[in-house]
């Protein structure tokens, strides 16, 4: 017989909460909690906008992938073309006589926002920047970045060069997860290739100047795009990724980014809804040496919830009972369905906490008697 038992999760020690809403001045924004895969804010997040130098993250990703599959190494030297040398905007001040390593170029793209470095990488990997941009677009689509189209490697203003804030956030997540051996470069404060750019040697990311756990990733600015930032910060067991675009000044970018990081960490906290191994319900056992067995969650269920205010959460236990012996510890016997207003329902397998051996003849007769007695009692109570 299918058993359904409703629980108040407050009895297990937690509650649902209401967060204080945050209104950002950014034209578009995306804020994400990595551990719980929770989007905390999305404002025009899927709309493609000019990304400016934030799109260099895709060029950097392509370089990291090329190193991962052995096409190049950090020590590989690359040729600087006239086109690369003539790039305007932020540069490493490369010239045709240079043979910068891939390591130099990656630092130049991340820290100096070097447009020349992007062209060198593009030509080194694909022959031309145009061919490389086409590869970037194709690769982005394969990675699930549905709203990204690239016309060049640097983010230089070009018709049709677009990325959404969500895509930039997903790209940041990939760089963090897939390339930990290189990710520390994003927190590097300065880089000056051959002592040529003392005024352009500092990382522009304003979050790196603050004591908030920031460790990346990239700023961007053009007249059309406004001021933007892809950032990430770690506090305790949590990592936040944020993407902002379309702000009016460097000061606004820095202020909004700091506010969003603080909001994400202070207004939300990790809560364990149910802990693995904690008895949730005692299920009747049929023909066992014991008359019941505890059902426990197979794993912890942790959710990121707003950290102020409170209201109840409910759960439903579902299992087929009585459960016939023998029963092995860890056997899946039911499920726990957790329901929180505003969140998707979570289903957790319930497993037997202990073994229950099959009983002998007398034990079986005792079990039959006890179960009949229990059902008779419940029937009389219902009347």
Where are these regions (language model features)?
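Residue-level detector of intrinsically disordered, flexible termini
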Residues: 16-20, 314
């Amino acid at each position: 017989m299918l058993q359904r038992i409703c629980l108040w999760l407050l009895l297990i020690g937690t509650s649902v909460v209401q967060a204080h809403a945050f209104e950002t001045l950014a034209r578009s924004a995306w804020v994400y909690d990595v551990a719980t895969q929770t989007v905390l804010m999305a404002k025009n997040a899927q709309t493609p906008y000019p990304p400016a130098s934030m799109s260099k993250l895709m060029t950097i990703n392509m370089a990291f992938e090329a190193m991962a599959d052995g096409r190049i190494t950090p020590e590989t030297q690359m040729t600087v073309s006239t086109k690369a040398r003539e790039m305007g905007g932020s540069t490493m001040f490369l010239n045709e006589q240079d043979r910068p390593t891939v390591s130099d170029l990656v630092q130049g793209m991340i820290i100096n926002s070097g447009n020349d470095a992007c062209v060198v990488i593009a030509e080194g990997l694909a022959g031309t920047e145009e061919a490389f941009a086409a590869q970037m677009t194709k690769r982005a689509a394969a990675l699930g970045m549905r709203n990204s189209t690239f016309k060049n490697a640097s983010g230089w203003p070009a018709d049709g060069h677009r990325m959404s804030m969500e895509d930039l956030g997903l790209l940041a997540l990939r760089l963090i997860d897939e390339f930990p051996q290189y990710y520390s470069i994003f927190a590097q404060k300065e880089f000056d290739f051959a002592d040529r750019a003392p005024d352009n040697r500092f990382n522009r990311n304003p979050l790196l100047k603050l004591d908030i756990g920031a460790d990346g990733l990239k700023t961007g600015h053009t007249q059309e795009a406004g001021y933007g930032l892809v950032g990430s910060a770690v506090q305790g067991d949590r990592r936040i990724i944020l993407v902002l675009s379309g702000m009016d000044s460097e000061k606004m970018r820095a202020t909004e980014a700091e506010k969003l990081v603080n909001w994400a960490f202070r207004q939300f906290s990790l809560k364990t809804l149910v802990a693995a191994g904690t008895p949730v319900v005692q299920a009747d056992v049929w023909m066992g040496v014991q008359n019941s067995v505890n059902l426990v969650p197979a794993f912890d269920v942790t959710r990121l919830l707003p950290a102020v205010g409170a209201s109840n959460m409910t759960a439903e236990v579902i299992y087929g009972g009585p459960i016939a012996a023998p029963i092995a510890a860890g056997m899946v016997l039911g499920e726990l369905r957790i329901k929180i207003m505003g969140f998707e329902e979570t289903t957790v397998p319930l497993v037997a906490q202990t073994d229950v051996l099959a009983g002998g003849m007398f034990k079986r007769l005792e079990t039959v008697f006890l179960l009949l007695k229990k059902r008779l009692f419940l029937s009389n109570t219902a009347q």
